[in-house]
Amino acid sequence: MSKIFVNPSAIRAGLADLEMAEETVDLINRNIEDNQAHLQGEPIEVDSLPEDMSRLHLDDGKLPDLGRMSKAGEGRHQEDFQMDEGEDPSLLFQSYLDNVGVQIVRQMRSGERFLKIWSQTVEEIISYVTVNFPNPSGRSSEDKSTQTTSQEPKKETTSTPSQRKSQSLKSRTMAQTASGPPSLEWSATNEEDDLSVEAEIAHQIAESFSKKYKFPSRSSGIFLYNFEQLKMNLDDIVKEAKNVPGVTRLAHDGSKLPLRCVLGWVALANSKKFQLLVEANKLNKIMQDDLNRYASC
């Protein structure tokens, strides 16, 4: 009678797949519960209504003036987008960035790619900075902090194309610096196509291609993941890894790369399975800590 031998690695792989399947089912159940929360019949507290709801009133015999309401709405929109002269611009900007961060997390949880979200967010921040932090020519850097409260009359000047280009570059740099994570380095080295840098990144990734790294899961636990599970070519992984802030500079210096951070970045942008399993907030903190630790070495 013949005996059937089962490879232990196949058993471990099957158990890992079962664990991932259970976590996926838990995630789907939580999403269903969240989407049906409005059907549970929970009462609405009057105190929790938005502030504008208290201004609404009903008239029995008069129809609302639609023209007046549209003008009021436009004025309200402009007030929300532009800063009041008496308010601190730094506090408003910080509040705006907090809202941007919340929006990024929501979009990432919905399955959108991080790079697409980030490019759109940068453009929005640039628009915000351009409107609320004007940079008129002829001002010194010392009185930039008082430019929002100054009452001096504006002088009409004809700006040259080179001046407009420099101002747009300054606003873009300001937005990237202010909106990016605090310790991430936005440098030109990340955009260099240096073959030696790509070779160094590919070499370090290839050495740890099958090594499994720990990542936080949505079920308040951890799961293991490696580069091999991405099902991507090494060239594509290297191309995506060069977008991680600071990685190109570390590779150029021959330093050790934060491979767990690189794997999390690439997987979050290319693997739907990884997006379903990972806890985005904890992952961002882990990636930031890895970058800080390797950059300080």
UniProtKB/Swiss-Prot annotation:
Pfam families: PP_M1
Effect listed in the UniProt record for changing residue 226 to H: In strain: Ni-CE
SUPFAM superfamilies in alphabetical order: Phosphoprotein M1, C-terminal domain
Biological process annotations from GO: microtubule-dependent intracellular transport of viral material towards nucleus; symbiont entry into host cell; symbiont-mediated suppression of host cytoplasmic pattern recognition receptor signaling pathway via inhibition of TBK1 activity; symbiont-mediated suppression of host JAK-STAT cascade via inhibition of STAT1 activity; symbiont-mediated suppression of host JAK-STAT cascade via inhibition of STAT2 activity; symbiont-mediated suppression of host toll-like receptor signaling pathway; symbiont-mediated suppression of host type I interferon-mediated signaling pathway; viral transcription
Motif Nuclear export signal positions after renumbering to this chain: 49-58
Molecular-function GO term, any one: RNA-directed RNA polymerase activity
Stretches for region Disordered: 57-82, 132-189
Gene3D superfamilies on file: 6.10.140.1560, Phosphoprotein, C-terminal domain
Keywords: Chaperone, Cytoplasmic inwards viral transport, Host cytoplasm, Host nucleus, Host-virus interaction, Inhibition of host innate immune response by virus, Inhibition of host interferon signaling pathway by virus, Inhibition of host STAT1 by virus, Inhibition of host STAT2 by virus, Inhibition of host TBK1 by virus, Inhibition of host TLR pathway by virus, Interferon antiviral system evasion, Microtubular inwards viral transport, Phosphoprotein, Viral immunoevasion, Viral RNA replication, Virion, Virus entry into host cell
Position of sequence motif Nuclear localization signal: 211-214
Region DYNLL1 and DYNLL2 binding: start-end pairs: 138-172
Residue spans of biased composition, Basic and acidic residues class: 71-80
The record's account of how the chain is modified after translation: Phosphorylated by host PKC and by an unknown kinase.
Domain of life: Viruses
Polar residues compositional bias, start-end: 158-180
Effect after changing residue 165 to A: In strain: RC-HL
Modified residues (Phosphoserine): 162, 210, 271
Entry's Gene Ontology cellular component terms: host cell; host cell cytoplasm; host cell nucleus; virion component
Family statement: Belongs to the lyssavirus protein P family.
Protein's job: Non catalytic polymerase cofactor and regulatory protein that plays a role in viral transcription and replication. Stabilizes the RNA polymerase L to the N-RNA template and binds the soluble protein N, preventing it from encapsidating non-genomic RNA. Also inhibits host IFN-alpha and IFN-beta signaling by binding and retaining phosphorylated STAT1 in the cytoplasm or by inhibiting the DNA binding of STAT1 in the nucleus. Might be involved, through interaction with host dynein, in intracellular microtubule-dependent virus transport of incoming virus from the synapse toward the cell body.
Designated name of the protein: Phosphoprotein
Lineage, top ranks: Viruses, Riboviria, Orthornavirae, Negarnaviricota, Haploviricotina
Gene: P
